[in-house]
Amino acid sequence: MSRIGKKPIPVPEKVAVTLDGLLVTVKGPKGELTRTLPEGVTIDQTDGLIIVSADSEKRKSRERHGLSRTLVANMIEGVNNGYSKQLEIVGVGSRAQVKGKTLVVSAGYSHPVEVIPPEGITFKVENNTNVLVSGIDKELVGNEAAKIRAIRPPEPYKGKGIKYLGERILRKAGKSGKK
């Protein structure tokens, strides 16, 4: 049995959860999320708690037990508080700005790179070098932040590029001169 999967999920008062077989719909103050859970799990709702259980002791069911519980918990947290990731742009002349909803990143290429957000994701830029990606879907926020970081990943010699706020870059020594 999954150690994470057997924990019940508390549902805050501001959040409404609707179960229809494996289809879970969560509504809260920040929005609404719907997801179909994988086969092999059962989900029940009793007095403010959601309990996810594995259908059988088969390996596939046990694998999906903890995953399903975490997915539902992330949906509840997302519609209640939301998620955000911060990125930092390091380097001379590298900056970002928001035009409408689109994020425009100047990262040392011959052209600026435009990132169009999917539905439910917003970009904010503080002092041209800090980008905040926020939304209610944890998976979508993480994917968009990873796409922005992939525009110019931090390089190991000077640390220039786009990195997550607080991310430590392993630095390498440069070439040593001929002796």
UniProtKB/Swiss-Prot annotation:
Xref: Gene3D superfamilies: Ribosomal protein L6, alpha-beta domain (3.90.930.12)
InterPro entries in UniProt: Ribosomal_uL6-like, Ribosomal_uL6-like_a/b-dom_sf, Ribosomal_uL6_a/b-dom, Ribosomal_uL6_bac-type, Ribosomal_uL6_CS
Secretion signal span: none
GO molecular function, one term: structural constituent of ribosome
Cell inner membrane listed as a keyword: no
Alphabetic keyword roster: Ribonucleoprotein, Ribosomal protein, RNA-binding, rRNA-binding
GO biological process terms held by the UniProt record: cytoplasmic translation
Lineage: superkingdom: Bacteria
GO CC field: cytosolic large ribosomal subunit
Family: Belongs to the universal ribosomal protein uL6 family.
Assembly information from the UniProt record: Part of the 50S ribosomal subunit.
Name this polypeptide is given: Large ribosomal subunit protein uL6
